[in-house]
């Protein structure tokens, strides 16, 4: 936990130091109560270097949460230990590296998916906003979740560990709140057909709500 926390803090510190506008955008929690999408200079390109750094930081966060999830799951924990009673450091590093790379590819892969399906639903202008708002919401939620788990570990040690069910409920609730938030945000910010918007979000965000933490 300590090593992973230092790594995440270092990465976000670099963005905060050299790209403060990007950092402020992705950690602007007040957006959850502001249902208006505004273009910003940091949103010009999803492949701008600071945005890539933030997506990579998000990939690390989700891989750490996935690692914690796997430790709590008896079947996945047994696979991680590979027959040994103690989890080896190299196995943990390999797991996190694989999950981080996979998550990074999937996050940018969803940008392509957004382009395809916004075109199918005739709401092409939504592809980039959907990507940025998804990344922003995910960074905020998984930062809170991860550092919450870190504080619990730091204060209580191994004496108390949140159950797999508790973490799953939190993640599933987040994804459900997110789809409702996206609907009202995009409805208020763009001139869209409400039926097309609802169908689009139900299709793309619905699968996220359905699978929840299992996607990690």
Residues covered by each model-derived region:
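Generic detector of multi-pass transmembrane helix bundles and their immediately adjacent loops
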Residues: 71-216
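Core alpha-helical transmembrane segments of integral membrane proteins
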Residues: 2-120
